[in-house]
């Protein structure tokens, strides 16, 4: 057996979710919990935000730049003519109500909007305000989490029953052996979601073949979820709220790999109207900070996305790729010719570039690497691709 190439790396396991880089994360929650306000401050847009259920009917969508100090450093260093950061696609989806899976509220339209997304910002209200009605009559974010979770699970249940009915006709009664493995896997999924009333992502030991089947159906409960707790400005600043511990306990029990991020929509909205100087002074006085950057970065990472940089005086750009992407496919994000004629990737680590101060110094320090087609691109790599065309060899 020939020796394994040094840059082959460990075997890549498939990721649950849609393949690609034009992925979306949806803001999901009950009506009147601050979704549109959060969307507005996140995207600096002016989507309608009113005090009545279903203010958002058709989903609003926007691209949000992913904040990154590495990108800013490269821009300051090169002073390029063009600056292109990575972006997170965010969708503001109409409020869900109990019974949506059976058509209540906006029902199936709402759930189809979630289906079109690849991750979920699960927003919940943990502030009291007599002027803002709550669709359930009282503020109880743990109850609200359970409503959302159950509606998503029920929609998946509907999809599983339909799929199993079809597979049983073909694979079991029809004797199609090719579909029998899919049928067996779907029986396991049924047991997990319908019989045990769990979400797909709560099970962490799906094997490669099972993940392939899950990715065929893209169940709502398979989507990564980040829990965002909307607090009053007062509670956020003092870091105290009676619901925070209860929410954390629920998430730790049922969705232990998920993150819970408290924020204040009112605070973020107020900060948006301030100048940079006023904002800095206000945050210092209140001994607090905005968490919008953290939320955007967390959402981007939850979609299994990362990026590499190309950097020079013409342009500094962050190129979005899926985690685990090999060098030729990363090159193809720039141009298909780069992938077709791939020769090598010349790679610098950002930290090495920052420490050494220039590309030539990185080379002199022996930290400039030439990587082949089996190299897995890492987040923050600074890359120059060499590739062949029918006419000549080029470098970018």
Swiss-Prot record:
Q: Which domain of life is it from?
A: Eukaryota
The entry's localization annotation reads:
Cytoplasm; Nucleus; Nucleus, Nucleolus
Binding, Mg(2+): 36, 56
Binding of ATP, residues = 32-37, 231
Molecular function, one GO term: ribosomal large subunit binding
**CC annotations in GO:** cytoplasm; nucleolus
The record's Pfam families line, in alphabetical order, gives: MMR_HSR1, YchF-GTPase_C
Q: Which cofactor does it need?
A: Mg(2+)
What keyword terms does UniProt attach to this protein? Answer: ATP-binding, Cytoplasm, Hydrolase, Magnesium, Metal-binding, Nucleotide-binding, Nucleus
**Residues spanning the signal sequence:** none
Give the motif span (Nuclear export signal). 267-274
Annotated OBG-type G domain residues: 23-283
Matching Gene3D superfamilies: 3.10.20.30, P-loop containing nucleotide triphosphate hydrolases (3.40.50.300), TGS-like domain (1.10.150.300)
Domain TGS: residue ranges: 304-387
Q: Does the keyword Repeat apply?
A: no
Subunit structure as annotated in this protein's UniProt entry: Monomer.
Q: Which family does it belong to?
A: Belongs to the TRAFAC class OBG-HflX-like GTPase superfamily. OBG GTPase family. YchF/OLA1 subfamily.
Q: Which PANTHER family match?
A: OBG GTPASE FAMILY (PTHR23305), OBG-LIKE ATPASE 1 (PTHR23305:SF11)
- Role: Hydrolyzes ATP, and can also hydrolyze GTP with lower efficiency. Has lower affinity for GTP.
Name of this protein: Obg-like ATPase 1
| Organism, scientific name | Xenopus tropicalis
Q: Tell me the name of the encoding gene.
A: ola1
């Amino acid at each position: 057996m020939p020796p394994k190439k040094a840059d082959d790396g460990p075997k890549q396991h498939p990721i649950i979710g849609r393949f690609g880089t034009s992925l979306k994360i949806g803001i999901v929650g009950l009506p009147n919990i601050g979704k549109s306000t959060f969307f507005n401050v996140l995207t600096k847009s002016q989507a309608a935000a009113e005090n009545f259920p279903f203010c958002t009917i058709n989903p609003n969508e926007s691209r949000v730049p992913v904040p990154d100090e590495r990108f800013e450093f490269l821009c300051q260093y090169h002073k390029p003519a063009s600056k292109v950061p990575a972006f997170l696609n965010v969708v503001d989806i109409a409020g869900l109500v109990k019974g949506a899976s059976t058509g209540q509220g906006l029902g199936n339209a709402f759930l189809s909007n979630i289906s079109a997304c690849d991750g979920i910002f699960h927003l919940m209200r943990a502030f009291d305000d007599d002027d803002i009605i709550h669709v359930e009559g009282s503020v109880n974010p743990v109850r609200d989490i359970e409503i959302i979770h159950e509606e998503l699970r029920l929609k998946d249940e509907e999809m599983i029953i339909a799929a199993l009915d079809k597979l049983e006709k073909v694979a079991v009664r029809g004797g199609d052996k090719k579909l029998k493995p899919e049928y067996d896997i779907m029986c396991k999924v049924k047991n997990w979601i319908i019989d045990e009333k769990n979400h797909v992502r709560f099970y962490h030991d799906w094997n490669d073949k099972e993940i392939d089947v899950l990715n065929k159906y893209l169940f709502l409960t398979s989507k990564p979820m980040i829990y965002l707790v909307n607090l009053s400005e007062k509670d956020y600043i003092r870091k105290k709220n009676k619901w925070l511990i209860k929410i954390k306990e629920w998430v730790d029990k049922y969705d232990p790999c998920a993150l819970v991020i408290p924020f204040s929509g009112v605070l973020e909205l107020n900060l948006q109207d301030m100048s940079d100087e006023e904002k800095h002074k206000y945050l210092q006085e209140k001994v607090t900070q905005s968490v919008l950057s953290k939320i955007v970065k967390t959402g981007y990472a939850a979609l299994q996305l990362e990026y590499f940089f190309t950097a020079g005086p013409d342009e500094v750009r962050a190129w979005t790729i899926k985690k685990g992407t090999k060098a030729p496919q990363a090159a193809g994000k720039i141009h298909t010719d780069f992938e077709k004629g791939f020769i090598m990737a010349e790679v610098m680590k950002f930290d090495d570039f920052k420490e050494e101060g220039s590309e030539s110094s990185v080379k002199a320090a022996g930290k400039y690497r030439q990587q082949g087609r089996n190299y897995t691109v890492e987040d923050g790599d600074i890359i120059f691709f060499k590739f062949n065309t029918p006419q000549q060899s080029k470098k970018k």
